[in-house]
Amino acid sequence: MKSKMAAKDQKRLDNASSSDTKIEFEFGGAPGVTLIMIGFPLLMYYMYIGAVLYDGLLPTPEDGQSWADFLSHLVSLAYTHAYPTRKAWTIYWTFLILEGAGYLYLPGVYGKGKRLPHLGGKQLPYYCSAVSSWYLTIAAALILHFTGVLKLYTLIDEFGPLMSVAICSGIFVSIVAYISALVRGVEHRMTGSHVYDFFMGAELNPRLFGWLDFKMFFEVRIPWFILFLLTLGTALKQLEEYGLVAGEVLFLLMAHFLYANACAKGEELIITSWDMYYEKWGFMLIFWNLAGVPMSYCHCTLYLAYHDPSTYHWNPWVLAVWAVAYLFMYWVWDTCNSQKNYFRAQERGVTVDRKTFPQLPWKYIENPQSIPTKTGDSILCSGWFGMARKVHYTCDVFFAISWGLITGFNSPFPWFYPCFFTVMIIHRARRDINRCRERYGEAWMEYERRVPYLFIPVSFADLPHKDKLTD
């Protein structure tokens, strides 16, 4: 048994070595990433100005106003309402530092990542304490709010300055990370284009004190915790102003809680993901997690916060049915990811069955069917992955559309995330398919023959009979 496992590990390592040294240009190369690095922060300011200062409408030049005057006006508004104040710097970086301390010192579990070819097959250890950090963060936020030390809706009132701090922090940390990697000589899979390499990153596994893995820390905690706190702040703001919380805000609070909670409770399963294993720590990951996700995905929250509940009121019965549908899709999404990750963990002989909330039925498959591949890995073709190859992506799109739909159609900004994310998820699905076809060859083609559906299964009729449901 041990010799078989060792042989499989060696096959995985040999296959990973070829992909680990392969150099590709994505996003249009250096010109494309330059446009992204300049354009996206500007888009964030434009959306903020429209959401807050134009009542959710698109800022456009007034009659007779030149484009030069209009752009100057936008810059003036950004400077006046989104200047990165000392208060905003203090709030943002206190949060980051405390979350970092929680990463290191709160209760958690240990895990090991994939074998890294550039480290001779070494598996890096990971300490996963996001669940403890998550619930302590919620408790601390509520204590600060109700004691009056820091009202949580300050995050809404000071959103402009906080967004600017997040943008500046994302750029600053990206510069430090890139220069640090070059100075220490730990750059990896470089293309020779400083602009492109700055965007994609230079270092693969940056760490602090040997344990705080920056990629995992930024991806799991920072964006989703901030997004939830913004929505919680909106709920508390409404409670103070109206004496109740609108059902639409409660719906969004539920949605953002479930997503952030899922990221925290499944942290030890993320350590073998593509982001942890392959993506380098550059502007793309750093800026996106520090600023892009929390400060642009939140426009559904901002719309609800800045408008009277009567302007986006849904029929309570429709809202209730919608919430039930959302919970069903969450169950599919959570168990789909769980089945995949448990299968990978079982394949490597290391599983940790944590009793974190919520515990859902069918989170893993007993005696799953799989297709062996030339790499030593196997392709799961049971459970949700026996019905469609990207069911979890379908759920992601449903979530995104729900976040926009809850606000109605009076503003385009809450729909930025659903539109952007849908395009991104389609691109990611195509990328995943191409990579899997290249990596697994005929085994992947066999999987496509067995499971011809990509996003939506043709029938759920035989769901209880395909695999044994397991709590």
From Swiss-Prot:
Catalytic activity: ergosterol + NADP(+) = ergosta-5,7,22,24(28)-tetraen-3beta-ol + NADPH + H(+)
Pathway: Steroid metabolism; ergosterol biosynthesis
DNA-binding found in the keyword field: no
Pfam families referenced in this protein's UniProt entry, alphabetically: ERG4_ERG24
UniProt EC number: 1.3.1.71
Compartments (UniProt record): Endoplasmic reticulum membrane
Keyword ATP-binding: no
Induction record: Expression is induced in the absence of erg4A.
One GO molecular-function entry: Delta24(24-1) sterol reductase activity
Binding residues annotated for NADP(+), in chain numbering: 340, 344, 380, 392-393, 432, 436-440, 447
Keywords: Endoplasmic reticulum, Glycoprotein, Lipid biosynthesis, Lipid metabolism, Membrane, NADP, Oxidoreductase, Steroid biosynthesis, Steroid metabolism, Sterol biosynthesis, Sterol metabolism, Transmembrane, Transmembrane helix
Known glycosylation sites: 15
Disulfide bonds: none
Top EC class of this enzyme: oxidoreductase
One of the GO BP terms on file: ergosterol biosynthetic process
Membrane topology annotation: Multi-pass membrane protein
Annotated family: Belongs to the ERG4/ERG24 family.
Protein name according to UniProt: Delta(24(24(1)))-sterol reductase erg4A
